[in-house]
Curated annotation (Swiss-Prot):
Matching PROSITE patterns: NATRIURETIC_PEPTIDE
Superkingdom of origin: Eukaryota
Designated name of the protein: C-type natriuretic peptide 2
Xref: SMART domains: NAT_PEP
Propeptide: 23-102
GO MF entries: hormone activity; hormone receptor binding
Gene Ontology CC terms, in alphabetical order: extracellular region
Main location (coarse class): secreted
Gene that specifies this protein: cnp-2
Statement: the UniProt record of this protein carries the keyword Disulfide bond: yes
Region: Disordered, residue numbers: 44-80
Keywords: Cleavage on pair of basic residues, Disulfide bond, Hormone, Secreted, Signal, Vasoactive
InterPro entries xref list: Natr_peptide (IPR000663), Natr_peptide_CS (IPR030480), Natriuretic_peptide_brain (IPR002408)
Signal peptide start-end: 1-22
Length: 126
């Protein structure tokens, strides 16, 4: 019995190894799928190996400081204007917030009466 099961195990292993070797490569299929989805140009970029100047996620290299032409320019006159705009915006929000709230009616919550079950009023809510 042991000889029969070990020989069938060996036969099964040989059969599976031959089946795996004769299977067509899936690399070609992936390339065709990528071409159909993204087009030939993006497919070539996706399949290309990464270059040394590519930054990878989590890389420990420090970013280079921006060149003077790329750096944001702050003019002292604009600074006061920006703060005035911000203050007026915050004041406007504060006014609308005060006028937007309605006084709560006794027993009412944010969305009216709160009911836990049929016929029982809840004190929970906002």
């Amino acid at each position: 019995m042991a000889v029969c099961s070990s020989s069938s195990l060996i036969l099964l292993t040989v059969f599976l190894s031959v089946a795996v070797e004769t299977r067509p490569s899936s690399d070609r299929d992936e390339e065709q799928v990528l071409k159909s989805l993204f087009g030939p140009h993006l497919t070539s970029l996706i399949l290309a190996p990464p270059t040394s100047n590519d930054s990878t996620e989590g890389s420990s290299g420090s970013p280079e400081p921006p060149t003077p032409s790329e750096a944001p320019v702050l003019i002292h006159g604009d600074r006061g204007t920006a703060s005035q705009i911000l203050r007026s915006f915050l004041r406007q929000r504060e006014k609308t917030r005060r006028w937007g709230r309605k006084p709560m009616v006794a027993g009412g919550g944010c969305f009216g009466m709160k009911m836990d079950r049929i016929g029982s009023i809840s004190g929970l809510g906002c």
